[in-house]
């Protein structure tokens, strides 16, 4: 699959989707995007900047949701133009798709909406690549149905059907907790879509602070190493200059100052794993019969 001018897949280096959870200000967006571009350029990692103009699924109705679509898209367009990086943002309603697709390079669907057929179809018919997040309630093999819906819709519109990614972001484990089953990354490859691992939402504790979500950012390096060792096409990470002051998802955000050292380790591991290949491709019962 070609994405934003670079090739993605298990036979290619991982690409990175990264940025603050929500757009807090234009200057912070520009500064963060510029720093991430410098890091990824030095390390040779293809990079897409992400940030949300609206967080429509906050725990509390009193929590900061964002700057709104009009202002948010204006800032993302400025980041794209000024910093020279492709940009991604998420949409939550069908009527947001057209104006957002006119600005960004990649759309993203929230995990909670992965079963909403009309929404997935509308996103697929936008003409943009779509990062489709797997619901916290969904089995990994069920993502094949979601990707198939997107592909069918794209073909019906006369659009390419190979522009969709399947993103793992953890699965609910009791109340206010998520776990990551690394088998799901291999299972989701059966969709035929590039698999992305969301390393920061996977350590989220949904609603764990009462009116907001908690998180365990100390496990981001652990799970991201595990995902890269399993084999993924891309990584998704939210990062912030000062997570303690972040207006959304600070507890699970990677401090911007730590991104380079984390990505350096992951880049080395990714190179090693992909050079060795993936035994599981022919390790099942049929191959052993």
Swiss-Prot record:
It is found in: Cytoplasm. GO terms for cellular component: cytoplasm. It comes from the Bacteria. Pathway: Carbohydrate biosynthesis; 3-deoxy-D-manno-octulosonate biosynthesis; 3-deoxy-D-manno-octulosonate from D-ribulose 5-phosphate: step 2/3; Bacterial outer membrane biogenesis; lipopolysaccharide biosynthesis. Keywords: Cytoplasm, Lipopolysaccharide biosynthesis, Transferase. InterPro entries: Aldolase_TIM, DAHP1/KDSA, KDO8P_synthase. It catalyses: D-arabinose 5-phosphate + phosphoenolpyruvate + H2O = 3-deoxy-alpha-D-manno-2-octulosonate-8-phosphate + phosphate. It holds the Pfam family DAHP_synth_1. Its main location: cytoplasm. One of its GO terms (molecular function) is 3-deoxy-8-phosphooctulonate synthase activity. It is an enzyme of class 2 (transferase). NCBIfam families: KDO8P_synth (TIGR01362), PRK05198.1 (NF003543). Belongs to the KdsA family. This is 2-dehydro-3-deoxyphosphooctonate aldolase. It comes from Cupriavidus taiwanensis (strain DSM 17343 / BCRC 17206 / CCUG 44338 / CIP 107171 / LMG 19424 / R1). The lineage of its organism: Bacteria, Pseudomonadati, Pseudomonadota, Betaproteobacteria, Burkholderiales.
